[in-house]
From Swiss-Prot:
Classification via Pfam families: 7tm_3, ANF_receptor, NCD3G
Record bears the keyword Disulfide bond: yes
Binding site for L-glutamate: S159, A180, S181, T182, Y230, D312, K405
PANTHER family with a match to the protein in the record: METABOTROPIC GLUTAMATE RECEPTOR
Tissues where the protein occurs: Is widely distributed in the CNS. Predominant expression is seen in the granule cells of the cerebellum.
Gene that produces this protein: Grm4
Cysteines paired by S-S bonds: C67-C109, C249-C538, C372-C388, C428-C435, C520-C539, C524-C542, C545-C557, C560-C573
Species for this entry: Rattus norvegicus (Rat)
Any one GO biological process: regulation of neuron apoptotic process
Protein name as catalogued: Metabotropic glutamate receptor 4
Membrane side Extracellular: residue ranges: 33-587, 646-656, 721-750, 809-821
Regions of this protein lying in the Cytoplasmic compartment: 611-624, 676-699, 773-785, 848-912
Domain of life: Eukaryota
Length: 912
């Protein structure tokens, strides 16, 4: 090798050459070893083309030891699978005919640094040894046996080991096909360009595990990874996929140290328990770490708390769960889709110490598998271990189950064989055996053929590689189940680009088929919105929608429209029920009772007055105004029915008209009466001439003028604000929307009601003032005193009405209280007028007709004299209340018959 290219090649490999020069004294020579014999710590099988093999025959050593205990399944089964595949290829006349494949198989001891040391054996043949200055004793040059050239390597198992070895092999352009390494880092074709694998990348596995987590409705899980490329890269891929897919949050991401200290696994379990809601644990760890995690969980008495989800490093292996079945129950594991190779089962079951001497570790396996010792000297005194007889048989005298990666080891060897076959077909057409173009085999060319292979594997599955050397993602999904005291891995689904999971076949500890929960927060109930925790989308607080809010979506509450309220579960809005004062309501009983009794009494009085219309007592009461007053009283009672009737345009219009009109008619008539009395007595003090407008016609005119003012105001109100009914949702808008009601009522505000009743109140107050002023008039001459008592009582009623009516404006029962208060007040006012002004007269008419006779007439002078003397008597002790003196003067006056031209104007008694 010369020129610039040669120097560049040597400079690139200078550090490795220095390493090899240091390592060379310990690298055993293969000179003189017979074919098929063990080669110290490696297996060597001669052939035309040699393939390297890397297998974890032993576990990682402790306390400074490179290697630990023997791994029967993961080490011996896989190693024998390569030997089985080589035998099949060498015996296949259609694959590499007349070309024998040899092997150099090394033990990695499950440690990347040890694997690096071992893999240097593969590149020895590529390092030219300079023997120019080395001379034999005879003075001649030394005879150097060149080691076999390894054209490709099968392995390694662990991803961290494969990464370490791949960095060496790529320098010497030696293709590598792994049967178990799944770390996503190895898909980087710029760094590991000579690396390929027949198992899918953990990127696919991570996606499959995310899909399983989502199918189980978990959204809050923790991850657990062995330190190294496999564990850390797998967890990183899982976290990345969970972010891309959304809906899965990582509670904790815990790393298992490469060299764990005592109590390390107990600390890991304690840390996982800090987020106790994250019961799902995603594990990317080697089987030793898996086992120690399960042991720590059992020591912490957490059997059944955690639900494990293991990667392909757990798969369907029995070693991690041996004697830990209860802790591992329910574990979901994933494994690249595979099938048991029956031919390998027959092959492996037939292996004995006699026919398998090429495997230098088989004797150690034999002792471990059958719990015996080959050498009698190895037997300890008092030990229960027996001596091996060599008559033991695998599968008969010991348990046997094919290891999960056996199929992939065979596929990896066949992939190398098919690539070499295609290469031989192209480079050596028609040649038997190797040709110069394949001696030596060019690694770069071989890599191209490896990437282009496409054949059916030993289990019938297609074996192909993508541009990064990865196999397509195809997985079987298992669950570790306990049934009737026996444990087994049961296939519950598969994943090929998308998930096929049979949840009904899953069994969980303590809950049967019910899916366990691994969630940060319980789902919010209907009517509750999520308030997510910052930085943790899967964790939230549930806040109920309050008041009149309803749940718009998972994160938003919105207030219902004004005329609506939320449904019971607050997921939507519904119309607020509309209520009104019903006829059968308790609030309507008293008003209706008073109204009915009042109307009956009023009609009774009217009928009585009509029947006895010409009797003296009816005439003396002033028939015209009496009937007007009775009409007003009747309207006051009738208003109750309008107030309780269902509000509509007609009802609301009638309410506006008659609510104040009945009172206006009543008080206008009473005011006219009291004003007439007052004017007569005031006029009599100054003159004997009669005041103006005291005739019945004038009195009616005055009364109707007063009433017309009320009607005029109502007409103006109708023009300014037409009458209509409304639904008031504010009156009964309670804090609890369940009790909210819309009140159907007439559109009459409190201010409008004050204006409506204000005029009637003005008439009432004015009438009361006149009643007070005429309180000194003798009772036998007028109705001033009954009117006064009527007005005093009415004022008391309305003074009680005002605080009750306006003091309940904020009550939820405002409609009922105010309507009842108003109608009762109006009815009581009418009842007071009816009772005090008419009932005594009706009583006399019906029960004392002897008193219903004409009385003598009195002149105005007599009336005035009586009034004057009455005022004088108020200064003495012999007086009646309100200054009414008992005078016989007016009682004994005899007035002659009325003449047409009489000097004094006379008035009928009681008509004044």
């Amino acid at each position: 090798m010369s020129g610039k290219g040669g120097w560049a090649w040597w400079w690139a490999r200078l550090p490795l050459c220095l390493l090899l020069s240091l390592y060379a004294p310990w690298v055993p020579s293969s000179l003189g070893k017979p074919k098929g014999h063990p080669h110290m710590n490696s297996i060597r099988i001669d052939g035309d083309i040699t393939l390297g093999g890397l297998f974890p025959v032993h576990g990682r050593g402790s306390e400074g030891k490179a290697c630990g205990e023997l791994k029967k399944e993961k080490g011996i089964h896989r190693l024998e699978a390569m030997l089985f595949a080589l035998d099949r290829i060498n015996n296949d006349p259609d694959l590499l005919p007349n070309i024998t494949l040899g092997a150099r198989i090394l033990d990695t001891c499950s440690r990347d640094t040890h694997a690096l040391e071992q893999s240097l054996t593969f590149v020895q043949a590529l390092i030219e040894k300079d023997g120019t200055e080395v001379r034999c004793g005879s003075g001649g040059p030394p005879i150097i046996t060149k080691p076999e050239r390894v054209v490709g390597v099968i392995g390694a198992s662990g991803s961290s080991v494969s990464i370490m070895v791949a960095n060496i092999l790529r320098l010497f352009k030696i293709p590598q096909i792994s049967y178990a390494s799944t770390a996503p880092d190895l898909s980087d074709n710029s760094r590991y360009d000579f690396f390929s694998r027949v198992v899918p990348s953990d990127t696919y596995q991570a996606q499959a595990m995310v899909d399983i987590v989502r199918a189980l409705k978990w959204n809050y899980v923790s991850t657990l990874a062995s330190e190294g490329s496999y564990g850390e890269s797998g967890v990183e891929a899982f976290i990345q996929k969970s972010r891309e897919n959304g809906g899965v949050c990582i509670a904790q991401s815990v790393k298992i140290p490469r060299e764990p200290k005592t109590g390390e696994f107990d600390k890991i379990i304690k840390r996982l328990l800090e987020t106790s809601n994250a019961r799902g644990i995603i594990i990317f760890a080697n089987e030793d770490d898996i086992r120690r995690v399960l042991e720590a969980a059992r020591r912490a008495n957490q059997t059944g708390h955690f639900f494990w989800m293991g990667s392909d490093s757990w798969g369907s292996k029995s070693a991690p769960v041996l004697r830990l079945e209860e802790v591992a129950e329910g574990a979901v594991t994933i494994l690249p889709k595979r099938m048991s190779v029956r031919g390998f089962d027959r092959y492996f079951s037939s292996r004995t110490l006699d026919n398998n001497r090429r495997n230098i570790w088989f004797a150690e396996f034999w002792e471990d598998n059958f719990h015996c010792k080959l050498s009698r000297h190895a037997l300890k005194k008092g030990s229960h271990i027996k001596k091996c007889t060599n008559r033991e048989r695998i599968g008969q005298d010991s348990a046997y189950e094919q290891e999960g990666k056996v199929q992939f080891v065979i596929d990896a060897v066949y992939a190398m064989g098919h690539a070499l076959h295609a290469m031989h077909r192209d480079l050596c057409p028609g040649r038997v055996g190797l040709c110069p173009r394949m001696d030596p085999v060019d690694g770069t060319q071989l890599l191209k053929y490896i990437r282009n292979v496409n054949f059916s594997g030993i289990a019938g599955n297609p074996v192909t590689f993508n541009e990064n050397g990865d196999a397509p993602g195809r997985y079987d999904i298992y669950q570790y189940q306990l049934r009737n005291g026996s444990a087994e891995y049961k296939v519950i689904g598969s994943w090929t680009d998308h998930l096929h999971l049979r949840i009904e076949r899953m069994q969980w500890p303590g809950s049967g088929q019910q899916l366990p929960r691994s969630i940060c927060s319980l789902p919010c109930q209907p009517g509750e919105r999520k308030k997510t925790v910052k930085g943790m989308a899967c964790c939230w607080h549930c806040e109920p929608c309050t008041g009149y809010q309803y749940q718009v979506d998972r994160y938003t509450c919105k207030t219902c429209p004004y005329d609506m309220r939320p449904t019971e579960n607050r997921t939507s809005c519904q119309p607020i029920p509309i209520v009104k004062l019903e006829w059968d309501s308790p609030w309507a009983v008293l008003p209706l009772f008073l109204a009915v009794v009042g109307i009956a009494a009023t009609l009774f009085v009217v009928v009585t007055f009509v029947r006895y219309n010409d009797t003296p007592i009816v005439k003396a009461s002033g028939r015209e105004l009496s009937y007007v007053l009775l009409a007003g009283i009747f309207l006051c009672y009738a208003t109750t029915f309008l107030m309780i009737a269902e509000p509509d345009l007609g009802t609301c219009s009638l309410r506006r008209i008659f609510l104040g009109l009945g009172m206006s008619i009543s008080y206008a008539a009473l005011l006219t009466k009291t004003n007439r009395i007052y004017r007569i007595f005031e006029q009599g003090k100054r003159s004997v001439s009669a005041p103006r407008f005291i005739s019945p016609a004038s009195q009616l005119a005055i009364t109707f003028i007063l009433i017309s003012l009320q009607l005029l105001g109502i007409c103006v109100w109708f023009v300014v604000d037409p009458s209509h009914s409304v639904v008031d949702f504010q009156d009964q808008r309670t804090l609890d929307p369940r009790f909210a009601r819309g009140v159907l009522k007439c559109d009459i505000s409190d201010l409008s009601l004050i204006c409506l009743l204000g005029y009637s109140m003005l008439l009432m107050v004015t009438c009361t003032v006149y009643a007070i002023k005429t309180r000194g008039v003798p009772e036998t001459f007028n109705e001033a005193k009954p009117i006064g008592f009527t007005m005093y009582t009415t004022c008391i009623v309305w003074l009680a009405f005002i605080p009750i009516f306006f003091g309940t404006s904020q009550s939820a029962d405002k409609l009922y209280i105010q309507t009842t208060t108003l109608t009762v007040s109006v009815s009581l006012s009418a009842s007071v007028s009816l009772g005090m002004l008419y009932m005594p007269k009706v009583y006399i008419i019906l029960f004392h007709p002897e008193q219903n006779v004409p009385k003598r007439k009195r002149s105005l002078k007599a009336v005035v004299t009586a009034a004057t003397m009455s005022n004088k008597f108020t200064q003495k002790g012999n007086f009646r209340p309100n200054g009414e003196a008992k005078s016989e003067l007016c009682e004994n006056l005899e007035t002659p018959a009325l003449a047409t031209k009489q000097t004094y104007v006379t008035y009928t008694n009681h008509a004044i």
